[in-house]
């Protein structure tokens, strides 16, 4: 009997990439596969996204793993390089990099490299995490244009902080800042990630950087990805390992936090926070068994959860349990837990098996 398994639908991944092509037809697509492709398996997902124009990762180790797996298309380090010692590896493996700090700029200026590196100057338009502040940006850009180790022209990128909140006004201000700086500069531009792709077509520019929507999950709190024509690629499943009679008034699990209001049948599912299921999931969080939703009862344990099957349940040991997937969206589970869908899909542990299918 299988226990915790994440079944990844390659057909859904390909569909989602094509959907982004439809939404941003004039832009190259940077398929963001960082954090193990948001829990979907970086190498397998990258090969499935073979029609993408390039790939985006957070760490040099991720880029090197892609190259070792035979990925030959451009790869950009979205956080940039972390040490001057990384620069020879960027040259050797033909990697592009964000440049967002004076330390990185100085490292590029001082390095002796066999050939220049393609860079993306990161402008801080309002995220205030990484990037060159607007008041220092012209001088920074000028130094990059004069650096012998930088492929010309210099490309420019930024990142939205509230693209999923169109009423906030923040994205308009960030775009205005970005446009003011990039005006007249010859390099490629990139500012839109998932939220920007969905809600801000004027931000698509030369490259878009889809992350979570590639995997069929929405970056928005109030809309599932299906609303925009995307298909969830992950189905997180396990199986019932016990079905038990349970009396009214009896508690379940650590701390006795849930008490049954009736005589019922409980199902014990072989999944827990040791597999990546959220420990914070409260009683009432739904799972899907034999086509119907049943609620979590009691606390999530390391290896198991307990669900209230109902007094007349006919479910049996070995029946499949869907924790989230196309028929029970991860966005709904996130709403129950207070965590984000990003967190849920990326927190799956090594104990959870990844399986790949080419399904409907």
UniProtKB/Swiss-Prot annotation:
Name the UniProt record assigns to this protein: Alanine racemase
Modified residues (N6-(pyridoxal phosphate)lysine): 34
Encoding gene, per UniProt annotation: alr
Family per record: Belongs to the alanine racemase family.
GO molecular function, one term: alanine racemase activity
Pfam family, one: Ala_racemase_C
Catalytic reactions on record: L-alanine = D-alanine
Active-site residue numbers: 34 (proton acceptor), 254 (proton acceptor)
Example of a GO biological process term: D-alanine biosynthetic process
Cofactor(s) demanded: pyridoxal 5'-phosphate
CDD domains: PLPDE_III_AR_proteobact (cd06827)
EC number(s) recorded for this UniProt protein: 5.1.1.1
The protein's annotated pathway: Amino-acid biosynthesis; D-alanine biosynthesis; D-alanine from L-alanine: step 1/1
Record-linked SMART domains: Ala_racemase_C (SM01005)
Keywords tagged on the record: Isomerase, Pyridoxal phosphate
Function description: Catalyzes the interconversion of L-alanine and D-alanine. May also act on other amino acids.
GO cellular component: cytosol
UniProt xrefs under NCBIfam families: alr
InterPro entries named among the record's database cross-references: Ala_racemase, Ala_racemase/Decarboxylase_C, Ala_racemase_C, Ala_racemase_N, Ala_racemase_pyridoxalP-BS, PLP-binding_barrel
Native source species: Pectobacterium atrosepticum (strain SCRI 1043 / ATCC BAA-672) (Erwinia carotovora subsp. atroseptica)
HAMAP family found in the cross-reference section: Ala_racemase (MF_01201)
Binding site for substrate: 129, 302
């Amino acid at each position: 009997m299988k226990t915790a398994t994440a079944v990844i639908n390659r057909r859904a991944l390909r569909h989602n990439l094509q959907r982004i092509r439809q939404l941003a037809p004039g832009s190259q697509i940077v398929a963001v596969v960082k954090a193990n492709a948001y829990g979907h398996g970086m190498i397998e997902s990258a090969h499935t996204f073979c029609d993408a124009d390039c790939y985006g990762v957070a760490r040099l180790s991720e880029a090197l793993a892609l190259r070792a797996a035979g990925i030959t298309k451009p790869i950009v380090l979205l956080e940039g390089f972390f040490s001057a010692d990384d620069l020879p590896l960027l040259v050797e493996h033909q990697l592009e990099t964000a440049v967002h700090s004076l330390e990185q700029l100085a490292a590029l200026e001082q390095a002796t490299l066999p050939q220049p590196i393609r860079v993306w100057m990161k402008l801080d338009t309002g995220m205030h995490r990484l990037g060159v502040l607007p008041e220092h940006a012209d001088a920074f850009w000028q130094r990059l244009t004069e650096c012998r180790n930088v492929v010309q022209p210099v490309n420019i990128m930024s990142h939205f902080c509230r693209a999923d909140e169109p009423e906030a006004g923040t994205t308009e201000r960030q775009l205005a800042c970005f446009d003011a700086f990039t005006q007249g500069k010859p390099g490629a531009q990139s500012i839109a990630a998932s939220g920007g792709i969905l809600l801000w077509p004027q931000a698509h520019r030369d490259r878009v950087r889809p992350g979570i929507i590639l995997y069929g999950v929405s970056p928005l709190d109030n809309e599932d990805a299906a609303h925009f024509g995307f298909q969830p690629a992950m189905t997180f499943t396990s199986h019932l390992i016990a079905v038990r009679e349970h009396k009214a008034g009896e508690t379940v699990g650590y701390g006795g936090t849930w008490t049954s209001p009736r005589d019922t049948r409980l199902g014990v599912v072989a999944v827990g926070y040791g597999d990546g299921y959220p420990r914070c999931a409260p009683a009432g969080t739904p799972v899907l068994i034999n086509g119907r939703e049943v609620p979590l009862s009691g606390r999530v344990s390391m290896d198991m959860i307990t669900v209230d099957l109902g007094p007349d349940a006919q479910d049996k040991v070995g029946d499949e349990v869907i924790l989230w997937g196309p028929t029970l969206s991860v966005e709904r589970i996130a709403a129950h837990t207070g965590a984000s869908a990003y967190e849920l899909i990326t927190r799956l542990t090594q104990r959870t098996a990844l399986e790949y299918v080419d399904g409907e």
